[in-house]
Amino acid sequence: MKIGIVCYPTFGGSGVVATELGKALAKEGHQVHFITYSQPQRLDFLNENLFYHEVNIPTYPLFQYPPYESALSSEMVHVAQYAGLDLLHVHYAIPHASSAYLAKQILASQGIRVPVITTLHGT
């Protein structure tokens, strides 16, 4: 399978879980595409089954906060089209699941069906 994984790239629990899951899936022969704003800390190598796609977050002087959700959705759409993803697995509801929902709707309007799995993390 070609799997997109969206996670926070930090050393925190969800980032560790998502990265280790992706590495294990790649070891089993799946193609895994990490989509996030920085290369995950525990993703210390890339190979023929492991890819990293950086979310480019534009800045606008009129916005107090950068539009990360829009940029993330856009990158998910791009990777799904480019890599032919079979599945998106997002970790965390906000902003990842909401961005995945938007990306799924954009892809559906183009006749592309990509199922989304959300893993909720929290303390």
Listing of model-derived features with the role each one plays in the protein:
Residues 16, 20:
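A conserved mid-protein helix/loop that constitutes part of the nucleotide-sugar donor-binding site
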Residues 1-4:
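Extreme N-terminal starter segment of soluble prokaryotic enzymes
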Residues 7-11, 23-67:
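N-terminal strand-loop element at the rim of the active site
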Residues 106-113:
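Short helix-capping segments at alpha-helix termini
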Residues 76-96:
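Short N-terminal targeting/anchoring amphipathic segment
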Residues 114-123:
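A short, histidine- and acid-enriched strand-loop-helix "catalytic/donor-clamping" loop
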Residues 66-75:
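Glycine-rich, highly charged phosphate/nucleotide-binding loops
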